[in-house]
Curated annotation (Swiss-Prot):
The gene is infA. This is Translation initiation factor IF-1. Residues 1-72 form the S1-like domain. Its main location: cytoplasm. Disulfide bonds: none annotated. Belongs to the IF-1 family. The lineage of its organism: Bacteria, Pseudomonadati, Pseudomonadota, Gammaproteobacteria, Enterobacterales. It comes from Buchnera aphidicola subsp. Acyrthosiphon pisum (strain APS) (Acyrthosiphon pisum symbiotic bacterium). NCBIfam families: infA (TIGR00008). Component of the 30S ribosomal translation pre-initiation complex which assembles on the 30S ribosome in the order IF-2 and IF-3, IF-1 and N-formylmethionyl-tRNA(fMet); mRNA recruitment can occur at any time during PIC assembly.
Length: 72
């Protein structure tokens, strides 16, 4: 699957789950479960409740995503 097929959306972290999973509320008020991308995990980027993040979704399953960027 190529990068062009993924959907990027902005959201806010509303809950922290075990195993570096997060519940994120997107701009369109949908709630998805997201995990941290490998580069963020490698660089020890900390994500807390209330952080604004960019989530990458696949068109096949819109309930799961990957956090690829944390805004300040």
């Amino acid at each position: 699957m190529s990068k062009e097929e993924n959907i990027e959306m902005q959201g806010v972290v509303i809950d922290t789950l075990p195993n570096t999973m997060f519940r994120v509320e997107l701009e369109n008020k949908h709630i998805v479960t997201a995990h941290i991308s490998g580069k963020m995990r490698k660089n020890y980027i900390r994500i807390l409740t209330g952080d604004k993040v960019t989530v990458e979704l696949t068109p096949y399953d819109l309930t799961k995503g990957r956090i690829i960027f944390r805004s300040r």
